[in-house]
Amino acid sequence: MSVLEESRPFAQQLFNVYFTILSLFCFKLFVKISLAILSHFYIVKGNRKEAARIAAEFYGVTQGQGSWADRSPLHEAASQGRLLALRTLLSQGYNVNAVTIDHITPLHEACLGDHVACARTLLEAGANVNAITIDGVTPLFNACSQGSTSCTELLLEYGAKAQLESCLPSPTHEAASKGHHEFLDLLISWGIDVDQDIPHLGTPLYVACMSQQFHCIWKLLYAGADVQKGKYWDTPLHAAAQQSSTEIVNLLIEFGADINAKNTELLRPVDVATTSSMVERILLQHEATPSSLCQLCRLCIRNYIGRPRLHLIPQLQLPTLLQNFLQYR
């Protein structure tokens, strides 16, 4: 009993120490959150000087280095395409890689507005071509969302990575979903992986099928995209059948899509198609009719050649008619 009584004061002291540390941590967290809300309030009200003062006083961010809490004049000039103002600000020492609270750089803004001249000026001044926002968006992704091939080519020339980690937003998927087939063609020419699989989106081909972007689907298949790879166990043909797109269904089957493939629910494409629809009839017809020998030979030859070498088909010593057949022309 006496041992228990002697241990109580020490336990009480230990509790007080931990409680004090927790209280200080909570207070510090409260101050930071309050400052962030206050800075955001000033930004919304347009009082940039006050927001910059808060950032400089409490976070040590000086003017010209880019406050995380505000858009700099450099951001405004880039977003509005004011090239002369942009050059003037850069000559005055503004940081070309200044970031906002969301880690958006002036280059992000220039690409989002399709201002190629501004983007070139920023890149020549040393802008980070692969800068990532808190949402994982790159300047290349912004250029893609606008379908800007000029900005895209410029960024790629300066070393932009078309594909980063699998969890980040992909320019390829964005182009496929919005139907920017010229942009997609440009990315393919730079050697992207057309089968890049993002867990919550699937492959670019699957995304294009869900969005019913026929020209993008054609570009991806022509570049050698795997017609069976979709999202988890759902194939692109499942997506096309769900969207009731007869043109896309026929195209996928022509490129060798398996009409008997099953998803996680053990459903085939014909099972997910609308009842009595044209898509259902097409799938049932192909189910009852085997592919032609010519079709099977073409698929076999293309698989044997391999995706990295499909562009070399025109160099094969084959009749032009046969080359066109192998290239689906």
Swiss-Prot record:
Expressed in endothelial and smooth muscle cells of collateral arteries as well as in satellite cells. It comes from Oryctolagus cuniculus (Rabbit). Belongs to the ankyrin SOCS box (ASB) family. ANK repeats lie at residues 69-98, 102-131, 135-164, 167-196, 200-229, 232-261. The keyword DNA damage does not apply. Pfam families: Ank_2, SOCS_box. The lineage of its organism: Eukaryota, Metazoa, Chordata, Craniata, Vertebrata. The keyword Repeat applies. SUPFAM superfamilies: Ankyrin repeat, SOCS box-like. Residues 278-329 form the SOCS box domain. Induction: Up-regulated in growing collateral arteries. This is Ankyrin repeat and SOCS box protein 5. Keywords: ANK repeat, Repeat, Ubl conjugation pathway. The SOCS box domain mediates the interaction with the Elongin BC complex, an adapter module in different E3 ubiquitin-protein ligase complexes.
